[in-house]
């Protein structure tokens, strides 16, 4: 590369840097628009954007006019003397200490992003939910909370401990990898700080969600994979890294293509595949693609949960506000997300364009490209259920491999970058120009509330319900005035909730036609309302249309697979369709989610009695006999079960309870004729 082209690349990269700063300023004046990825300067006063812009320009101007951005680096070999281990250890300890203190001191005080207050409330229960999509994270948080039993706010503290610990672990892993990859201290620090400046870093500041350890695992996977590609580790180390990521979150599956590449490339089989004719390669690719498409279509049609996990290609009955793969809303959200996670991308991309082609050859870059494309594909096709501005954390893991790739490309080709150290400073600075305000906005409660309120006008179907988080925030902070105000706003804007409440009232009054219409209106407001679908299914059972009822219940479960009430309703729909095994499974799933529920047990009793499954029937009877909330029909069933087993004393006590609740005494007289040993205690 000529000196002229080196200088040209620097000038264009500086222009990209300045453009990003200006974009942040523009975003600060448009917080109410879909600029959530770059409007973070807006929440700190009118002068803050201009101060930050001035700092960014002063930094670039100083580096440029001092000649640091135009210094060309002479070609050097990789035989430079190794850095003394003690010196790098001291530097690493200082970095770990600084970041660790920052994670602790600036931990989040508000939890509006992601599903924060909702999952915090769930973890505070006696039987917290562990989602199948994030088993590892869920179990880890449950274990930590139980270990802190007796400590005030143990649920919140468990999130904070895990988040901050994951952050410190991430810093340590990055520094260890930098030490293994590069010899020069400057290169190690640039690579490490580059990775630590990524937008995913907010997850390490006591963030309340189930993604911090998963992001750490993706960081471990990325860096271990890079070391394997460089020949510094055995290729089989990538498998436990993959297993850890998949265990923590289902999105770990996106790492699989990179695993296949590492295991196959540079092997006899891999070299044989590489040597095949072009037609043979295309044929293999076609077969693999067809197999993948076939599997995808099967799962797409077999499971509503799988189908609804993806942004639809075209509008359908579940589309909210026209949000499809090709919609302008989705495209803007993706751009915002990528700017948020990879702030330095424009600068580093410009520098990469001017690198020689040899910079992109080798297993290391092939590994990075496969991995980056795989994880970025997830951000494109996976559905942000809460809306991308709040669900950004679901996709945060995708930023780690891409940021690592860009900074590795920069450091590994430093001899082709004019003013390499200074240009690296600008790229890293861009990351912190976004990350620091984001952290501050969540650490300062007033800023967190202001930021969240700016989100409440973007997605009417999702964000109107999110107003309940403001109520929860003020309740936790014991601000009764703010809580009352938030409740009033929530009621005023919660059109879906009002329609659902109206429908439930009409259903209780046996006005099933009108109730169904209310639920349909709720679905117009929010096409993804699981509550509306499950109650619409109950209406269709009353209309004697069990097949339609079952369809609605399957949709409801696809939208909310973990709700015990919906699972109970699904079991009832299966029961009326005479699919008894699936009904039984659904009811036991409901009880697994909430062991206190009575209704699934009553339905299980009904089914076991109908199918003459005496042993199972008796088992359910024993489990509910002492419950104080049994209605009269259930008490009669329990009493009959005890009579059948000649347990007359228990039967008598059960019937006394039933009589107290209004059971017809004549029934007792009839029972005594066939069971003369039955004695009902006096009132």
Regions found by a protein language model. Give the residues of each.
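Transmembrane signal-anchor helices characteristic of membrane glycosylation enzymes that use polyprenol
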Residues: 12-31, 47-66, 84-113, 285-303, ...
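Extracytoplasmic catalytic/substrate-binding loops of multi-pass membrane glycan-assembly enzymes
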Residues: 105-121, 128-144, 153, 157
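Short acidic/glycine- and proline-prone juxtamembrane loop motifs at membrane-interface regions
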Residues: 114, 203-213
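Transmembrane-helix motifs of polytopic, lipid-linked glycan transferases
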Residues: 161-182, 220
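Transmembrane-helix signature of polytopic, membrane-embedded enzymes
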Residues: 174-197
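Membrane-interface alpha helices of multi-pass inner-membrane proteins
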Residues: 219, 235-250, 256-260
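Membrane-lumen/periplasm interface segments of specific transmembrane helices
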Residues: 258-262, 279-353, 375-378
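Canonical tetratricopeptide repeat
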Residues: 501, 535, 569, 603, ...
């Amino acid at each position: 590369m000529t000196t002229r082209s080196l200088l040209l690349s620097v000038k264009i990269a500086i222009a990209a840097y300045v453009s990003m700063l200006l974009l942040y300023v523009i975003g600060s004046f448009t917080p109410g628009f879909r600029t959530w990825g770059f409007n973070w300067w807006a929440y700190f006063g009118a002068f803050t954007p201009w101060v930050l812009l001035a700092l960014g320009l002063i930094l670039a101007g100083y580096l440029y006019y001092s000649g640091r951005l135009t210094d060309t680096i002479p070609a050097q070999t990789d035989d430079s003397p190794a850095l003394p281990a003690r010196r790098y250890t001291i530097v690493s300890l200082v970095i770990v200490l600084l970041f660790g203190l920052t994670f602790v001191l600036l931990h989040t005080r508000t939890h509006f992003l992601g599903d924060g207050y909702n999952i915090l409330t769930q973890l505070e229960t006696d039987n917290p939910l562990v989602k199948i999509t994030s088993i590892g994270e869920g179990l880890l948080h449950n274990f930590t909370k139980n270990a802190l039993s007796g400590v005030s706010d143990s649920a919140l503290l468990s999130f904070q401990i895990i988040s901050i610990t994951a952050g410190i672990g991430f810093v340590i892993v990055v520094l260890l990898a930098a030490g293994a990859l590069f010899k020069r201290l400057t290169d190690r620090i640039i690579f490490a700080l580059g990775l630590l400046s990524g937008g995913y870093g907010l997850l390490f500041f006591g963030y309340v969600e189930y993604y911090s350890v998963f992001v750490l695992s993706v960081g471990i996977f990325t860096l271990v994979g890079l070391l394997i590609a460089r020949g510094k580790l055995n290729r089989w180390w990538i498998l436990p890294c993959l297993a850890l990521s998949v265990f923590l979150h289902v999105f770990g599956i996106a790492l699989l293509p990179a695993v296949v590449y590492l295991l196959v490339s540079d092997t006899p089989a891999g070299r044989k595949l590489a040597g095949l004719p072009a037609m043979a390669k295309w044929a293999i690719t076609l077969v693999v693609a067809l197999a993948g498409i076939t599997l995808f279509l099967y799962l797409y049609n077999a499971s509503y949960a799988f189908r609804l996990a993806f942004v639809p290609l075209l509008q359908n009955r579940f589309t909210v506000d026209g949000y499809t793969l090709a919609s302008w809303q989705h495209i803007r959200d993706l751009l915002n997300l990528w700017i948020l996670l990879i702030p330095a991308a424009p600068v580093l991309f410009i520098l990469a364009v001017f690198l020689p082609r040899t910079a992109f050859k080798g297993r290391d870059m092939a590994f990075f490209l496969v991995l980056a494309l795989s994880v970025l594909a997830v951000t494109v096709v996976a559905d942000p259920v809460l809306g991308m501005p709040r669900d950004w954390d679901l996709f945060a893991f995708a930023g780690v491999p891409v940021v690592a790739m860009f900074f590795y490309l920069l450091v590994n080709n430093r001899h082709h970058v004019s003013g390499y150290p200074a240009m690296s400073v600008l790229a890293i600075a861009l990351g912190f120009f976004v990350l620091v305000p984001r952290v501050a906005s969540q650490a300062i409660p007033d800023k967190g509330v202001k930021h969240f309120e700016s989100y409440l006008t973007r997605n009417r179907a999702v964000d109107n319900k999110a107003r309940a988080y403001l109520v929860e925030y003020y309740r936790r902070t014991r601000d009764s005035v703010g809580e009352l105000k938030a409740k009033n706003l929530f009621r005023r804007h919660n059109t879906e909730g009002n329609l659902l409440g109206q429908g439930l009232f009409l259903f209780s009054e046996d006005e099933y036609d009108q109730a169904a219409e209310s639920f349909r209106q709720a679905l117009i407001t929010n096409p993804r309302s699981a509550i509306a679908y499950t109650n619409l299914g109950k209406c269709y059972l009353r209309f004697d249309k069990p097949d339609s009822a079952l369809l609605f219940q399957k949709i409801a479960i696809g939208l909310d697979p973990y709700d015990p009430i919906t699972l109970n309703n699904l079991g009832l729909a299966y029961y009326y369709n005479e699919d008894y095994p699936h009904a039984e499974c659904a009811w036991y799933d409901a009880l697994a989610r909430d062991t206190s529920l009575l209704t699934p047990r009553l339905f299980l009793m009904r089914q076991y009695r109908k199918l003459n499954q005496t042993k199972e029937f008796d088992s359910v009877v024993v489990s509910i006999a002492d419950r104080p909330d049994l209605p009269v029909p259930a008490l009669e069933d329990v009493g009959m079960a005890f009579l059948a087993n000649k347990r007359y004393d228990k039967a008598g006590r059960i019937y006394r309870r039933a009589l107290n609740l209004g059971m017809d005494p004549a029934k007792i007289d009839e029972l005594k004729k066939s069971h003369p040993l039955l004695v009902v205690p006096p009132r």
